[in-house]
A protein has these predicted regions:
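Conserved short beta-strand edge segments in small beta-sheet-based binding/regulatory domains
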Residues: 77-89
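Short S/T/G/P-rich N-terminal loop/turn motif that feeds into the first structured element of a domain
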Residues: 1-70, 90-103
Length: 103
C-alpha cells in the first residue's frame, strides 16, 4: 500500500457542498477508497493561503485516479501528490490549521 501527501487548491464556492457530502457519510462508503478519502478530507489542513494538504492511502496508478474521478476534481484544482511513509504526512501537517475549523 502507498501513502501520499496531497496538496490542492479548494474551489471555494464548492467547499460548503463538499462539507455537507462528508457529513452525509456518502463519501465514506464509496468503494474501494471511501474510508481513506473521507478521513483525509475531514482532517485536511491549510498548508498556505488557499492550499489544502492531507495524507491519503491509495493503491491506484496514477495515484488518486479513482478519487479524482469521483470527488477531488470537482472540488479541487492543482492537485499534487508526494509519496510518504504511513503517518509521515500527518505528523508533518498536524500543527497546521484544519480547513474545516478546529473543534
Amino acid at each position: 500500500m502507498a501513502y501520499y501527501l496531497v496538496t490542492a487548491k479548494p474551489i471555494e464556492s464548492k467547499m460548503e457542498a463538499l462539507r455537507q457530502w462528508l457529513d452525509s457519510g456518502e463519501i465514506r462508503v464509496m468503494k474501494p477508497f471511501g474510508q481513506a478519502l473521507h478521513m483525509g478530507l475531514d482532517n485536511a489542513r491549510w498548508q498556505a493561503e488557499g492550499v489544502a494538504i492531507w495524507e491519503e492511502e491509495d493503491y491506484c496508478v496514477p495515484p488518486l485516479a479513482q478519487e479524482r474521478a469521483a470527488v477531488l476534481d470537482e472540488y479541487f484544482t492543482e492537485l499534487e501528490v508526494k509519496h510518504v511513509s504511513k503517518g509521515e504526512g500527518w505528523k508533518h501537517i498536524e500543527p497546521l490549521k484544519k480547513i474545516w475549523g478546529d473543534p
